[in-house]
Structure formats: C-alpha cells, structure tokens
C-alpha cells in the first residue's frame, strides 16, 4: 500500500476500480441501525483509522478490531441503544470519499449525543483501508465524564 503525494493509496492499481457515490451510500447505510456490523463488512481487517482530537475515543487504530474496541465498544457501554449514524453529505472521487455523518443517541444519564462527524475515507478493491475521522471532541469528553465506564474514570 503506497501513499501518493496527495495522500491517496495506489497499491494494486490494475485491480482498483473507482468507488461510486451509490456504493458509498449503500456501505454507510449499515451504520444507521446502531450496531454497525453491515458497515464493518466493508472495512479491511488491517484498516488504518485515526480518530482526531483529545478525547476518550481519539487515537490511531491500526486494525478493525482495535478500532471497534477503542470506539464503538466504548460507546456501546454508555449509549444503551448504540449510536445511529446517518450519512448526510458525501463527496466521492476515484478511491476516496468524504462523508459527513450525524449521530443520534441517548446516553445512560439521558444526555442527548447528537454529534456530527466528517470521515475522510480511502478505498481499495471495494474495502475501506484508511479513515481520518473528525468529530465534536468536547461532546465526546462530556459524554464519558457524565457516563463513566467502570474502571476507567481516572483515564477520561
């Protein structure tokens, strides 16, 4: 997987087909139900996923398992019904997409967790291989301060 100067990936170019707007929309539909498994079927096991910011979910995750454990699993402990994420705006070019998402959720303490996200997504052979995710860091911090995960209070 070689990174070009523009930040895109151009490995296996002979197999690479541009991703379409309809395909990206279909993939992201898998996040609307709150569990995400349909979405994660389209994420490479060795995905390189960076959640920007200085909050309890921020970090550089070097595979799908680590990303899910560090983000979705933690959110599942404080959002009883999970976070329903809806893709609202998409820009797709070649093997890249920029996806604006809006989450709808209620925390254990009743706090509304309606966050906004921007994910810069890179595809290879139809799978998501790299993501840079941006979100409201202050809202995430507040969520975990008001709804601590047992045993992690001192780390949030």
Report residues per predicted region.
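A beta-strand edge to alpha-helix "cap/lid" segment located at domain peripheries
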Residues: 9-16, 73-156
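Short glycine/serine/threonine-biased micro-segments
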Residues: 32, 51, 108
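A solvent-exposed, acidic/Ser-Thr-rich amphipathic alpha-helical stretch
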Residues: 44-94
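Hydrophobic pocket/interface hotspot
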Residues: 24-27, 38-43, 47, 67, ...
């Amino acid at each position: 997987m070689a990174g070009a100067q523009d930040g895109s990936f151009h490995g296996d170019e002979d197999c690479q087909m541009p991703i379409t707007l309809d395909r990206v929309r279909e993939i992201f539909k898998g996040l609307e139900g709150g569990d995400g498994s349909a979405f994660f079927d389209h994420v490479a096991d060795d995905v390189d996923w960076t959640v920007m910011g200085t909050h309890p979910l921020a970090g550089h995750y070097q595979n799908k398992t680590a990303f899910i454990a560090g983000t979705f699993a933690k959110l599942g402990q404080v959002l009883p019904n999970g976070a329903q994420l809806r893709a609202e705006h998409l820009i797709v070019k070649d093997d890249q997409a920029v996806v604006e998402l809006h989450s709808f959720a209620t925390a254990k303490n009743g706090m509304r967790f309606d966050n906004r996200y921007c994910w810069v997504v890179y595809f290879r052979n139809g799978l998501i291989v790299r993501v840079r995710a941006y979100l409201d860091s202050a809202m995430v911090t507040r969520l975990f301060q008001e709804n601590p995960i047992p045993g992690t209070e001192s780390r949030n």
